[in-house]
């Protein structure tokens, strides 16, 4: 096959090099963006008088036919044509003849691929943002049902203070909200049109770059041709944002794995989101949660691949940049798959309220409330802390809990204790007393849910 760049060469490319060099096996997914960009470029060439308007129309019409053929499965791609750009151009030329060879006027594959990736990533960011918003809405729905479901809050994976399941779920809602904001920020920097930068130094033709940007829905035009063809910061930013999404999913999945175990027994996952063992008949495994947790490493690896690829590249374009796509595509695919399966797994899990409440009543999660009670009675906090610590030790030695001690026993640790102490250390009331903004009290949680729903409605 004659290469589109073959004029300077006297020998055919070695078959091993063709296979090694070709990217069509993975960049084929960019075909829609490549064709859309080429149609806008062709129309601009005609509008600017760089090629006759009738030829521009013929090229644009031919590209529409190529798109239809690809989507109908009537057109195939070849390794010999190297990449999606040259495959599309050859398919176009086969349809419209020699005029198709004018499409690449004032354009390089360097600015062409930068355009394709940016268009692709903008669309994918929009899709992932939609999935994040759906997940936040599901979390809010679940939280609203569990404002009174008391459970232990943990530090160091040891029971610390009582909270509610609703409050716990809202913590993740905050994380996914930040993820959404990071993606929006990344999209803003992705929304820059590089076409017209040429190979690296622009072109002598009178291009109307602003027209192309408008046709393709870009907010801005790249201001430096060297940067336009070599910039992959936006891909790194996306992979970093995707990594944080995966961190948040992984943390949640770790808790789901723990909570579904017999040792915690806080939840039971639906059969549809669990698997069994080929040997042990009794097993019900949280494989979906474990897989999401495991896939976190893939996206971290994609981020590292992009950073490592870029770290030693001189300006402007280098073939190393071909390696950006598989890492970027994998990060996109992995995050989308994980978000798609995580939401229904969460929505269908059974919450064991009594077991959560029982766990909250154990582990002295009301110890801080007893200390606060003594502070309100006039004891300095440090002294209150020490007194309650001794009370906890007393309970541990006797297999008791604080709320099961008699008034006389409690007064051994502070004479300030009165009969109202039992109200202060009741687990449900401990939660209800934390009415501070952002706290776990049911009223505070419902207010947080209301604000979160409002934010979801306001964001486009």
Curated annotation (Swiss-Prot):
One of its GO terms (molecular function) is argininosuccinate lyase activity. It catalyses: 2-(N(omega)-L-arginino)succinate = fumarate + L-arginine. It comes from the Bacteria. Keywords: Amino-acid biosynthesis, Arginine biosynthesis, Cytoplasm, Lyase. GO terms for biological process: arginine biosynthetic process via ornithine; L-arginine biosynthetic process. Transmembrane segments: none annotated. Its EC number is 4.3.2.1. The keyword Amino-acid biosynthesis applies. It is an enzyme of class 4 (lyase). Its main location: cytoplasm. PROSITE patterns: FUMARATE_LYASES (PS00163). It is found in: Cytoplasm. The keyword Manganese does not apply. GO terms for cellular component: cytosol. Belongs to the lyase 1 family. Argininosuccinate lyase subfamily. This is Argininosuccinate lyase. It comes from Pelotomaculum thermopropionicum (strain DSM 13744 / JCM 10971 / SI). The gene is argH.
